[in-house]
A protein has these predicted regions:
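C-terminal motif of bacterial Sec signal peptides marking the signal peptidase cleavage site
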Residues: 15-16
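Positively charged n-region of N-terminal signal peptides that target proteins for export
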Residues: 1-5
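Surface-exposed loop/turn elements that mediate protein-protein interactions on large endomembrane-trafficking
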Residues: 118-138, 182-195, 253-261
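Short aromatic loop motif centered on NTY/YTY
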Residues: 191-262, 267-268
């Protein structure tokens, strides 16, 4: 009789526990579904701003538009630098250079932008001819910035390529160069800029040096290779110049906050 009395109680306890577990599972499923709905709602509510008036005006000067990937090797560099011919004014230069990425590659750009803006001011105020008449060896003869194509990342994100070209008075010491800079526009907002191409050099015989920067740009980021060569005028036993070479390999990732250096190292 005791066994018969306990059996109904055991069955009742088992059913109660089963119902409790089912309720917990349903609650968890409902909670998960609710979280997914909230996440989807937040994603749908992201508002992409319109392009600023300054950017709209600037983009009227673009030469072409390319999809990624884009190869900026020696051949691509030559074609690109020849195709970039629409001059940038001081306001546009300041807009594009306002957030240069803190990186080894942009040290040269920062310095050139300072000289570029000073030269633009001379030309605007009518003092450029007087400046040319006062040129001496080693002085900057001219420097200009020009608008290039855009590289399309997606509907609301792209890179603006622009060029700085400069040269000194034609005597030793002499220097000249072409810089290609990429400015990132992410979801219609201008973020920052970084150097992606360079061909430059200078000499004060027998000392000389040159630099080349080429890049491969795809939907994930930019891989840049910088090659520096220099000679201090020294020769080996056979009379050949002793040339020092250094190669730096960098990967620049782009995200909603702008360009970010992911890795950097010396290859040689």
């Amino acid at each position: 009789m005791k066994i018969l009395f306990l059996t109904p109680i055991f069955v009742f306890f088992f059913i109660s526990c089963s119902n409790s577990d089912s309720g917990t599972e349903k609650s968890e499923v409902q909670s998960t579904d609710s979280s997914e709905v909230v996440a989807d709602t937040l994603a749908d509510s992201v508002v992409i701003p319109e392009l600023s008036e300054d950017l709209v005006s600037l983009l009227q000067k673009k030469t072409k538009e390319y999809d990624l990937p884009f190869e900026l090797d020696s051949v691509g560099f030559a074609k690109l630098s020849e195709a970039i011919d629409k001059r940038l004014n001081s306001k546009e230069i300041k807009l594009l250079s306002q957030n240069l990425l803190d990186h080894e590659y942009t040290e040269e750009v920062n310095w050139r932008v300072e000289h570029l803006l000073k030269m633009e001011e001379r030309k605007r105020k009518g003092g450029y001819e007087e400046y040319l008449n006062s040129l001496d060896i080693g002085m900057l003869r001219d420097i200009e910035a020009s608008m290039g194509p855009i590289l399309r990342i997606d509907e609301h994100s792209f890179m603006i390529l622009w060029k700085i070209e400069y040269g000194s008075y034609e005597a030793c010491p002499y220097y000249s160069g072409t810089l290609i800079i990429a400015s990132l526009v992410y979801q219609n907002e201008l973020k920052n800029s970084i150097l992606v191409g360079e061909v430059s050099g200078g000499a004060d015989a027998p000392v000389w040096g040159d630099t080349e920067v080429y890049s491969t740009i795809d939907s994930k980021g930019i891989r840049s290779i910088r090659k520096d060569r220099s000679c201090e005028g020294e020769e080996d036993e056979e009379g050949n110049e002793i040339i020092e070479e250094k190669t730096t390999d960098s990967y620049i990732h782009f995200e909603e906050t702008g360009f970010r250096v992911e890795k950097e190292g010396n290859s040689k």
